[in-house]
């Protein structure tokens, strides 16, 4: 049996009320009032993607044997080093063995976390690895008075994969890759360049995620009704609900997108939502996880 052996997360303690943003910046861009609910998580001045990843990894590995880890994969779109192995820093902070361990960075799109998880699971299934720690973290800067400022939050999550003491068995995966430019950030740039919102909602989230989930169901023979929780990131509230309707999902089975409590944490967000679902899961529950970013990865797990 291969699957998740432990999980952890880290959300910075600081919060920014979205209403405070509205009170100060709505004069410039009034549309932000439409998404002013709740608050977003904000990293402290001395935090970055690596420090948050380490915190999530510590939470994940509490009480576990770190010496048994033979792979550390770090996913992020905001890695602080361009020419230094960021995953190696996380591994060193955890005192993971230097010899016989494969560390790797996964980057360049917000589905990098799930791609790293699939790579880890395939490595374990093939017998090349025994225990792989996958961590995803993001600290995305935004321009003031933009929808991204309202939507994005900072955070990290970690999943340990292996064959022993599995708490959620891996049941399969499916991926589609689409060079869909909902946003992009060039080298050396501080902020994303975003395309028109309706394009992102309707042709991005609203089309790509349902298509990927349908492909997974067709590949595995599973049915959407089999799942107790279905997880997919989408910071557009109406589109998040619309995807569920398109899939024929009971709204009660859709995992909350956590907009009101922390915001969208980028590469970490599918894992952040998965950790929240695992906290409330019961043995036998099946959980489907999808990501989004120049395509979509879909994974399924069954809680043991």
Question: What are these language model-derived features?
Answer:
Residues 1, 75-81, 107-112, 136-141, ...:
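Acidic, glycine-rich active-site loops and adjacent beta-strand->loop/helix elements
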Residues 1-49, 146-203, 207, 300-304:
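Condensing-enzyme catalytic core mediating Claisen C-C bond formation in acyl metabolism
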Residues 4, 49-114, 219-242, 246:
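Conserved beta-ketoacyl condensing-enzyme motif
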Residues 7, 135-138, 162-164, 172-174, ...:
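Fold-independent oxyanion-binding glycine-rich loops
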Residues 27-47, 78-131, 242-273:
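Conserved catalytic cysteine-centered active-site region
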Residues 54-58, 87-91, 114-121, 157-161, ...:
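Predominant activation on well-ordered alpha-helical scaffold segments within soluble catalytic domains
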Residues 62-70, 96-101, 125-134, 207-210, ...:
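Structural signature of cysteine-dependent C-C bond-forming condensing enzymes
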Residues 123-157:
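Flexible, glycine-rich active-site loops centered on histidine and acidic residues
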């Amino acid at each position: 049996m291969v699957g998740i052996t432990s999980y952890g997360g880290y959300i910075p303690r600081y919060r920014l009320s979205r209403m405070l943003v509205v009170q100060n910046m709505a004069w410039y861009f009034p549309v932000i009032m439409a998404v002013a609910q709740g608050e977003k998580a904000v990293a402290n001045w001395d935090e970055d993607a690596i420090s948050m990843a380490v915190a999530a990894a510590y939470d994940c590995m509490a009480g576990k044997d770190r010496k048994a880890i033979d792979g550390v994969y770090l996913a992020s779109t905001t890695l602080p080093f361009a020419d230094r192995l960021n995953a190696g820093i996380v591994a060193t902070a955890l005192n993971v063995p230097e010899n016989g361990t494969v560390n790797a960075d996964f980057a360049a799109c917000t589905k990098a976390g799930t791609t790293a998880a699939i790579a880890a699971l395939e490595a374990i299934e093939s017998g090349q690895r025994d225990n792989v720690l996958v961590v995803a973290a993001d600290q995305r800067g935004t321009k003031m008075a933009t929808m991204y400022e309202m939507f994005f939050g900072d955070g990290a999550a970690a999943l340990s994969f292996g064959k022993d003491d599995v708490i959620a068995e891996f049941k399969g995966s499916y991926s589609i890759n689409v060079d869909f430019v909902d946003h992009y950030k060039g080298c050396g740039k501080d902020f994303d360049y975003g395309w028109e919102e309706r394009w992102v909602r309707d042709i991005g989230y609203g089309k790509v995620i349902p298509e990927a989930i349908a492909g997974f169901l067709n590949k595995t023979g599973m049915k959407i009704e089999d799942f107790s929780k279905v997880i997919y990131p989408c910071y557009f509230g109406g589109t998040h609900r619309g995807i569920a309707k398109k899939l024929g999902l009971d709204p009660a089975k859709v995992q909350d997108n956590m907009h009101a409590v922390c915001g969208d944490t980028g590469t970490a967000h599918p894992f952040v939502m998965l950790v929240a679902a695992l906290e409330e899961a019961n043995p036998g529950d099946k959980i489907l996880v999808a990501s989004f970013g120049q395509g979509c990865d879909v994974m399924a797990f069954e809680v043991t």
